[in-house]
From Swiss-Prot:
Annotated protein name in UniProt: Uncharacterized permease YojA
Membrane-spanning parts: 2-22, 24-44, 52-72, 106-126, 134-154, 174-194, 228-248, 261-281, 305-325, 343-363, 377-397, 424-444
Stated family: Belongs to the GntP permease family.
Keyword field contains rRNA-binding: no
Organism of derivation: Bacillus subtilis (strain 168)
InterPro entries in UniProt: Glcn_transporter (IPR003474)
Length: 444
C-alpha cells in the first residue's frame, strides 16, 4: 500500500536524523532510494527521478536563494536592516510590533512566493527581534504564517491561479473571497497560535535563529546607517518590482509585444537580480564601500547557505520519488467515488496529496483535476472550490516539503521543535481555512 510505504519512509527519515544523527541531506537521499524501491519503481529510473527532484527544486530556488542571500547580506552589512527595525519599533511600539510584521508580511506575500518572501523578510524580522530582545520565533512564526496563507489562497500565486482556471472560477472573485477568508485565517494561525505555542513549547522560543548566510551580526550607530526609505525600498524592491510587473501584465492584452517583456522581468529570478544590482549601488557604491568589501560580503553569503540548498534539494528528491512512484494516482483512485460535499472532498484530497507529495502546488493542481467533475452545475461556487483546495494544499508541512527545512534552518530549530511549531501551525491554518470556506458556502 503506497500510503503505508510513505509513512514508513518518513519514520526512517526521522530515525536517521534524530537518533543516528546522520546528515539531513544524506538521510533524505537514502530514504528517497528506499521509498522508490518500496513503491516498485523501475530500478533504472530511480536515480533519474532523484536527480530530477533535486534539479527541479533547486532550479526554482537556487537562483532566488543565492541572490536573496546576497541582497540580504548587503543590506545587513550596510545597516539597512537595523534602520528598518528601529523605525518600525519607533512607529508601532513594542506592543504592536507583531501586528505590524503580520500586516507587512501579508501584503508582501500577495506578490511573492513563500520562499522568496521568507528570504527577504527573515533578516528584517531578526533585526527587530534582536533590538527588542524578543524571541525570534515570536515575530518569525506569524510572519511565515501570513506568507503561507497568501501562497495557498490568493492569486497571482501559481496554484490558486491555475486551479481557478480548472474550476472555471473568476480570478477577481477568488482574490476577493480569498482575502476575506485569509484575514481571519492569518490571525488565528499567526498571533493566536503563537500565544499557544509559546506556552506549550517554550524551548523553541529560546532559539536565536541561524542566519549564517548573512554572516556575523554587526553593531551600528543609527546616524551612520542608510535612511529608512532607501533601506526599505532596497530590501523590498523585488516585491515592488514583481507587483508592478503583475499589474502591467494583467492590463496588457494577450498579444501585446510588451507583455512577454513585462512577464520576463517580473519573474522572481530576474527581479532578484535587478534588486541585487540596485543594492550594490545603494548599500555599497553610494556609501563609499569598496568593491573588494562588497565582493567579500557576497562570497560569504553564498558559501554559508550551501548546506541549506543541499537539504532543500534533498527534499525535492523525496517529493519527486513519491510523484513518480504513483502515490498521487493512488490517492486519486481512492477518492474517485464519493458522496461528500465537493468543498470537503477538494480539501481532503488536497490535504492527503500534500501529506504524501510535499508540494502544495502539485497537491492543488492534482486535486483540481480530480475534484472538478464532482461539482454539479451551480451546486457550489467555483471560487470556494479554489479556496477549499488551497486550504488543503498547505496542511501539515513536514519533511517532504522545502518550506519545512527552510523554517527549521532559518529559525535554528530541532526536528521536534519544527514539528511542534511549523507543522502544527500549517495544520491549524489549513483547518481554519476550511472552516471559513464551509461557513462561506452556507451563505452563498
Amino acid at each position: 500500500m503506497p500510503i503505508l510505504i510513505v509513512a514508513v519512509g518518513v519514520l526512517i527519515l526521522l530515525f536517521l536524523i534524530i537518533k543516528v544523527k546522520l546528515n539531513t541531506f544524506v538521510s533524505l537521499i537514502v530514504v528517497s532510494f528506499l521509498v522508490a524501491i518500496g513503491l516498485g519503481m523501475d530500478i533504472n529510473k530511480i536515480v533519474l527521478s532523484i536527480e530530477t527532484g533535486i534539479g527541479g527544486q533547486l532550479g526554482h530556488l537556487a537562483l532566488v536563494f543565492g541572490l536573496g542571500a546576497m541582497l540580504g547580506r548587503l543590506v545587513s552589512d550596510a545597516g539597512g536592516g537595523y534602520r528598518i527595525a528601529i523605525t518600525l519599533i519607533d512607529k508601532f511600539g513594542r506592543k504592536r510590533i507583531q501586528a505590524a510584521v503580520v500586516v507587512a508580511s501579508f501584503i508582501i506575500g500577495i506578490a511573492l512566493f513563500f520562499e522568496v518572501g521568507l528570504v527577504l523578510l527573515i533578516p528584517i524580522v531578526y533585526a527587530i527581534a534582536k533590538e527588542l530582545k524578543m524571541p525570534f520565533l515570536y515575530l518569525g512564526i506569524p510572519m511565515a504564517a501570513a506568507l503561507n496563507v497568501t501562497h495557498g489562497f490568493l492569486p497571482p500565486h501559481p496554484a490558486p491561479t491555475a486551479i481557478s482556471v480548472a474550476y472555471g472560477a473568476h480570478i477577481g472573485q477568488v482574490l476577493l473571497f480569498g482575502i476575506i477568508i485569509a484575514v481571519p485565517t492569518t490571525v488565528i494561525a499567526g498571533p493566536l497560535f503563537n500565544k499557544f505555542a509559546m506556552k506549550r513549547f517554550p524551548g523553541a522560543y529560546q532559539k536565536h535563529g541561524n542566519l549564517s548566510g548573512l554572516g556575523p551580526r554587526k553593531e551600528f550607530q543609527l546616524d551612520e546607517t542608510p535612511g529608512f526609505a532607501i533601506s526599505a525600498v532596497t530590501s523590498l524592491f523585488p516585491v515592488i518590482f514583481m507587483a508592478m510587473a503583475t499589474i502591467f501584465s494583467l492590463l496588457l492584452s494577450e498579444h501585446s509585444k510588451g507583455k512577454d517583456i513585462i512577464e520576463f522581468i517580473g519573474t522572481p529570478g530576474t527581479a532578484m537580480l535587478i534588486s541585487l544590482l540596485l543594492a550594490l549601488y545603494t548599500m555599497g557604491y553610494a556609501r563609499k564601500i569598496s568593491m573588494q568589501e562588497i565582493g567579500r560580503s557576497i562570497s560569504e553569503s553564498i558559501s554559508q547557505i550551501a548546506m541549506m540548498l543541499l537539504i532543500i534539494g534533498g527534499g525535492g528528491a523525496f517529493k519527486q520519488v513519491l510523484i513518480d512512484g504513483g502515490v498521487g494516482d493512488y490517492v486519486a483512485d481512492f477518492f474517485r467515488q464519493t458522496n461528500m460535499s465537493p468543498l470537503f472532498v477538494a480539501w481532503t484530497i488536497a490535504a492527503v496529496l500534500r501529506l504524501c507529495l510535499g508540494s502544495a502546488t502539485v497537491a492543488a493542481l492534482t486535486t483540481a483535476g480530480m475534484a472538478a467533475p464532482l461539482m454539479e452545475a451551480g451546486s457550489v461556487n467555483p471560487a470556494l472550490m479554489v479556496l477549499a483546495t488551497g486550504a488543503g494544499s498547505v496542511i501539515a508541512c513536514h519533511v517532504n516539503d522545502a518550506g519545512f527545512w527552510m523554517v527549521k534552518e532559518f529559525f535554528g530549530l530541532s526536528m521536534k521543535e519544527t514539528f511542534q511549531t511549523w507543522t502544527l501551525l500549517t495544520t491549524v491554518l489549513s483547518v481554519t481555512g476550511l472552516g471559513c470556506v464551509l461557513l462561506a458556502g452556507l451563505v452563498m
